[in-house]
Swiss-Prot record:
Keywords attached to this entry: Endoplasmic reticulum, Fatty acid metabolism, Heme, Iron, Lipid metabolism, Membrane, Metal-binding, Microsome, Monooxygenase, Oxidoreductase, Transmembrane, Transmembrane helix
Protein name in the entry: Cytochrome P450 4F8
UniProt catalytic activity: an organic molecule + reduced [NADPH--hemoprotein reductase] + O2 = an alcohol + oxidized [NADPH--hemoprotein reductase] + H2O + H(+); (5Z,8Z,11Z,14Z)-eicosatetraenoate + reduced [NADPH--hemoprotein reductase] + O2 = (18R)-hydroxy-(5Z,8Z,11Z,14Z)-eicosatetraenoate + oxidized [NADPH--hemoprotein reductase] + H2O + H(+); (4Z,7Z,10Z,13Z,16Z)-docosapentaenoate + reduced [NADPH--hemoprotein reductase] + O2 = 20-hydroxy-(4Z,7Z,10Z,13Z,16Z)-docosapentaenoate + oxidized [NADPH--hemoprotein reductase] + H2O + H(+); prostaglandin H1 + reduced [NADPH--hemoprotein reductase] + O2 = 19-hydroxyprostaglandin H1 + oxidized [NADPH--hemoprotein reductase] + H2O + H(+)
Enzyme class at the top of the EC tree: oxidoreductase
High-level lineage: Eukaryota, Metazoa, Chordata, Craniata, Vertebrata
Species of the source: Homo sapiens (Human)
Similarity comment: Belongs to the cytochrome P450 family.
Function (record text): A cytochrome P450 monooxygenase involved in the metabolism of endogenous polyunsaturated fatty acids (PUFAs) and their oxygenated derivatives (oxylipins). Mechanistically, uses molecular oxygen inserting one oxygen atom into a substrate, and reducing the second into a water molecule, with two electrons provided by NADPH via cytochrome P450 reductase (CPR; NADPH-ferrihemoprotein reductase). Catalyzes the hydroxylation of carbon hydrogen bonds, with preference for omega-1 and omega-2 positions.
Length: 520
């Protein structure tokens, strides 16, 4: 039998065996992987030295806990962006760098690159996959481009025009509830809670043509949507739950699975019922019936969509897009509306000017209803809304993973394999872009002032090829609801100052409380 000489180790010769050889090969492979990873880690670290970084807690924790999802964390972030206006690196532990980009000129290089170079396939987005599937938010590559082309017509102004009446009716229901509460002596409201229900009510009508009356009574579907949103936030704050197989063994994971199934069943039922109607009536008669009702909902548009080769969206694709729109459309709009009411409550002179603008627009009109063409006739209200979206952006941040090196305008390079945090809150609070960024000043958005700024200085709906496809829908809804609210109520601050908390959207810890006074 052949012998394997280990004399150089000071050991006597032993008989060679397949197991020993396998052990040596395995150990060599593992050592090679460790050496390769170590080299790549240090090489990446050297390349990142061109980006400044705050002082670490220590070598092991890095910057963990520096910017927390709390009011204090946002204040720290504001200080960091004043110190590092171009951006900075944060280390989450000893081995995970995150490149935080805070300046429009730097952000442009990342946002405007192809999605093949900067993708969204990173940890946070994966936690949404069981709920949202491969909708526009999560899909990448050819599938994303194909769906984006097919969905763009769904947000054409001819489709959006009839939704104005839906926005108004949902706002009317919310306002009637506020009037009742005021008569009962309850003038202090958590406006975020009320507006979230109102936006969910509108979305259900716009997407499914379904009225659940969720503002007046509990709705199983709406409750499931709100539970899923809360569970996603909770999951992303607990690192050990990132793996699906671990998460779905937990009580929260099982609740998530049940809520997902309920939401999917509802969407599937609507799609199947609508497809049966379309098949039995034929496209022409179906469209004729829709023309009489003057509303083509989101499901209708998706069912009728086809590419140049005649390929339609599958039922699974339609469900993913409908669920994505429900997820992306309710809390973001609720956040934007809640914070603009807060800012106008703190600045009564701007609130009164907005109110006078709406009153002047509708003075000869009964009933007092907003129409599509009116939205362009509210310039000061629009300025106030945009300034609030700057100061309190609904989506505080989003991330991109770099699959290739990205060269910045100043010749620095973001190395392949790193995650970039496009920090909308930091960009909007950057003193090198916005003088006195903590001051609420609607005149920043006077058209003359706006022309002087980079288009990347104000990106509440993201920017570039993957910007929010529903931003016109969201802006229209916010303008309608804000105008009608100011027409009917005076908004006053509460003694409780809100503590901002950046979750998926920018919320207020323990609610955003304001006082509402009905106007005569």
């Amino acid at each position: 039998m052949s012998l394997l000489s280990l004399s150089w180790l000071g050991l006597r010769p032993v008989a060679a065996s397949p197991w020993l050889l396998l052990l040596v090969v395995g150990a060599s492979w593992l050592l090679a992987r460790i050496l390769a990873w170590t080299y790549a880690f240090y090489h990446n670290g050297r390349r990142l030295r061109c980006f400044p970084q705050p002082r670490k807690q220590n070598w092991f924790l890095g910057h963990l806990g520096l910017v927390t999802p709390t009011e204090e964390g946002l204040r720290v972030l504001t200080q960091l962006v004043a110190t590092y206006p171009q951006g900075f690196v944060r280390w989450l532990g000893p081995i995970t760098p995150i490149i935080n980009l805070c300046h429009p000129d730097i952000v442009r290089s990342v946002i405007n690159t192809s999605d093949a170079i900067t993708d969204k396939d990173i940890v946070f987005y994966k936690t949404l996959k069981p709920w949202l599937g491969d909708g526009l938010l999560l899909s990448v590559g050819d599938k994303w481009r194909h769906h984006r082309r097919l969905l763009t017509p769904a947000f054409h102004f001819n489709i959006l025009k009839p939704y104005i009446k839906i926005f108004s009716k949902s706002a009317n229901i919310m306002h009637a509830k506020w009037q009742r509460l005021a008569m009962e002596g309850s003038t202090c409201l958590d406006v975020f809670e009320h507006i979230s229900l109102m936006t969910l009510d509108s979305l259900q009508k716009c997407i499914f043509s379904f009225d659940s009356n969720c503002q007046e009574k509990p709705s199983e579907y709406i409750t499931a949507i709100m539970e899923l949103s809360a569970l996603v936030v909770k999951r992303n704050n607990q690192f050990f739950r990132y793996k699906d197989f671990l998460y779905f063994l937990t009580p929260c994971g099982r609740r998530f699975h049940r809520a997902c199934r309920l939401v999917h069943d509802f969407t599937d039922a609507v799609i199947q019922e609508r497809r049966r109607t379309l098949t039995s009536q034929g496209v022409d008669d179906f469209l004729q019936a829709k023309a009489k009702s003057k509303t083509l909902d989101f499901i209708d548009v998706l069912l009728l969509s086809e590419d140049k080769n005649g390929k339609e969206l599958s039922d699974e694709d339609i469900r993913a897009e409908a669920d994505t729109f429900m997820f992306g459309g309710h809390d973001t709009t609720a956040s934007g509306l809640s914070w603009v009411l807060y800012n106008l409550a703190r600045h009564p002179e701007y609130q009164e000017r907005c109110r006078q603008e709406v009153q002047e627009l509708l003075k000869d009109r009964e009933p007092k209803e907003i129409e599509w063409d009116d939205l362009a006739q509210l310039p000061f209200l629009t300025m106030c809304l945009k300034e609030s979206l700057r100061l309190h952006p609904p989506i505080p941040t989003f991330a991109r993973g770099c699959t290739q090196d990205v060269v910045l305008p100043d010749s620095r390079v973001i190395p392949k394999g790193n995650v970039c945090n496009i920090n909308i809150f930091a960009i909007h609070h950057n003193p090198s872009v916005w003088p006195d960024p903590e001051v609420y000043d609607p005149f920043r958005f006077d058209p003359e002032n706006a022309q002087k700024r980079s288009p990347m200085a104000f990106i509440p709906f993201s920017a570039g090829p993957r910007n929010c496809i529903g931003q016109k829908f969201a802006m229209a809804e916010m303008k309608v609801v804000l105008a009608l609210t100011l027409l009917r109520f005076r908004i006053l601050p509460d003694h409780r100052e809100p503590r901002r908390t950046p979750e998926i959207v920018l919320r207020a810890e323990d609610g955003l409380w304001l006082r509402v006074e009905p106007l005569g």
